[in-house]
Amino acid sequence: MNRIRTLTFDLDDTLWDNREVIMAAEQALHDWLGEHYPRVTDRYSLEDMRRMRTDLVGQEPDLRNRITDLRKQSLRLAARTVGYDEELVDPAFAIFIAARHRVSLYDDVTPALHRLRKAGYRLGSLTNGNADVYRLGIAHLFDFSLTAESVGRAKPHPRLFEEACRLSGVSPAELAHVGDEADTDLAGGLAAGVNVIWMNRLEQPATPGITPHAEVRDMAGLLAMLGIEAQQSRN
C-alpha cells in the first residue's frame, strides 16, 4: 500500500463506540414519546420499533440507503396506528438525532487524524449512518465527508468509494478505507477496488470470504502500518 494518497474512515464503531450511543438515543426517543404521545409507547416497545424498521426495509429495500427516512417512516406508521397525527414525527426525530450525536471519540482518533494530515494524506469519512461530522464538531479533521444518503447508495455498494476517489482525485489503488464492518466497509471497498484496512478494535474473528489488505487494532496500529512514526522521527 505504498501508493496510498487518500484515507477514508467509517464513523460508527470505527471512530467511536456507537452501540451505547444508539441505545441511549432510542431510549431518549422512547421516553419522550412516553411523556408526550403515550399511546405509542403503550403499544410499541423499543424492540417492537426495531422490528418495525426491519419490516419496513423488507417492504422497501431502498430505505437501507435512507436511514433518516427509515426512522421517520417508522414513527409515522406508529403514530397512525395508535391514532396520533403525523405531526409528531419531526419533533420526535429531533430528540433522537440530538442524542445520536452525543458521541465520545476514541482517545486515539483526533491525534491520529492530525498526524495523518501532517503526513500529507487526504482524509475523508464514509458512513451509512446519519451522524453529521459538522454537528459533531469534527468536520475540520476531514477534507470531505460522504454519507449513504448523500450519494444514494449504502456500503457495500461501491458508489461511496467511487465518489471518494473522484473527490480526492485518486485512483482506487491510491485510496485506503478504514472500517470495522466486514459486510459493508470491507466487502464494499474490495468490490470498488480500493485498499481496505480492518479496524478490529474488539478483536472479532475474521469473516470467511472477506480478506482485508491489512488489519489493525487501533489508530496507533494504523499509524505504525503507514510508517508515520518513522517518518516523523527522521524529520
Across the structure, where does each feature detected by a protein language model lie?
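N-terminal helical cap/lid subdomain that shapes the substrate entry/recognition surface
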Residues: 2-107
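Asp-based, Mg2+/Mn2+-dependent phosphohydrolase catalytic module
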Residues: 1-7, 19-20, 84-89, 110, ...
